[in-house]
């Protein structure tokens, strides 16, 4: 399981710990990943995703998983999230027609 958010693509970053004496040692900055279950209102199902706390706030802000995925860019999404986005778009197109 990779340490990357499935919705925003946030992953591990690298940098330095810097002491008061300006000594530098390499370190990793890990994303704050949470295992959450989000409900798709369009599909009527719940999906278990591993997303960052920041992504969870963004999903809530945009009004749910469906709205977040419709507005998000495909290159940031994981393969599973892209599949989910296509399913939602297809279902919404059927409902509109």
From Swiss-Prot:
GO cellular component entries: cytosolic large ribosomal subunit
Keyword Ribosomal protein included in the entry's annotation: yes
Keywords per UniProt: Ribonucleoprotein, Ribosomal protein
Gene Ontology MF terms in the entry: structural constituent of ribosome
Gene Ontology biological-process entries: translation
Database matches in InterPro entries: Ribosomal_bL28 (IPR026569), Ribosomal_bL28/bL31-like_sf (IPR034704), Ribosomal_bL28_bact-type (IPR001383), Ribosomal_bL28_sf (IPR037147)
Gene3D superfamilies linked: Ribosomal protein L28/L24 (2.30.170.40)
Entry keyword annotation includes Hydrolase: no
Superkingdom of the organism of origin: Bacteria
HAMAP family given in the database record: Ribosomal_bL28 (MF_00373)
Record-stated family: Belongs to the bacterial ribosomal protein bL28 family.
Name this protein carries in UniProt: Large ribosomal subunit protein bL28
Native source species: Brucella canis (strain ATCC 23365 / NCTC 10854 / RM-666)
GN (gene name): rpmB
